[in-house]
């Protein structure tokens, strides 16, 4: 009888332990998914390095800062962080030692992340990520600008109170989920919302604020982030919800293809999200009204195409375009296939008020990553090695003024030289290879 009772007790304890292990495994797996949604690996890794080990340089107006090691290494990472330490860093912007984090860490967006999701993220980073012994790099910001106490003042003035996201009364649950992902974990506004002179985002949500997601006010690492609102020319007004779903999932659709920093978002984050979450994000973005409701829909102008078809490349920049660009982007500014962006108007591209992204991609090229469902990676070669500053300025002005793009020829050789100086280093920077991360799982 005693043996039977003992066996029953041991069996019950074993079952309970198994159930706990399964629950913990499920929590870690959920945290992994949420880390994908937050695209944590993109900033906290460098190309050729280990995922989440930090070291990615981020240029700021006052110097360069480097992302930190967020692996569970107890000496150089966050292995000795309690849950409270972790959530204070992520949602409040306060490190374990009490220092305020640089707002390159989007803690103002993460302030709405729920306790349940924070606990899952903590479980993943403590138990699902390989520890890496790699010391953090000090910033290149000179003293006295490197002092942290002004950041604490900035945080007190501009960071929102930490308050878990709550759907609005009668809000469509799909829209609510999309809003949570876009405004919270996805931190889309960190790049796509303009900032004030004091560097805070002009809006953290769409609550009566048409600045939200209306496009970056200044380049970020040499790229400008596009308007995600419903504007007809420089926004997503011409896109359907299905267009957005395709772009988010694959980084390409019938309108454009991803370039710049958005390629990392597609590769490391969006391609891994569920169909339901991709739909929720797309539906929420399509619910955003235009910032400038007076914008007319882009209309293609074929005058330049007709001239090029006749062999007339006398317009400044036209001969460079024909020699270097037309094979893929065609003489009418469209594109050879859905794998390539067109040279005619597209959000974030040829007709944008700020030409920085276009100059950047001409100089350094870019790669559209292969993703699940669209495995072919397509690379645009860099042309900075064989085009001088004046030639780059000429072809950028030609593209921006042709096919109905409507921009004036304002780019100078000096503008190109300035950006080229920065891109000499930046072109060789990047993020961790996603395959390295997948091999760890």
UniProtKB/Swiss-Prot annotation:
Originating species: Pantoea cypripedii
Listed Pfam families: Cytochrom_C (PF00034)
pH dependency: Optimum pH is 5.0.
Ranges in coiled-coil conformation: none
Enzyme class: oxidoreductase
Protein name in UniProt: Gluconate 2-dehydrogenase cytochrome c subunit
InterPro entries noted in UniProt: Cyt_c-like_dom, Cyt_c-like_dom_sf, Cyt_C_IC, Cytochrome_c-type_DH, Membr-bd_ADH_cyt_c
PTM info: Binds 3 heme c groupd covalently per subunit.
Sorted UniProt keywords: Cell membrane, Electron transport, Heme, Iron, Membrane, Metal-binding, Oxidoreductase, Repeat, Signal, Transport
Subunit structure: Heterotrimer.
A GO CC term attached to the entry: plasma membrane
Recorded superkingdom: Bacteria
Subcellular location: Cell membrane
Annotated binding of heme c 2, by residue: 188, 191-192
Lineage of source species: Bacteria, Pseudomonadati, Pseudomonadota, Gammaproteobacteria, Enterobacterales
Gene3D superfamilies membership: Cytochrome c-like domain
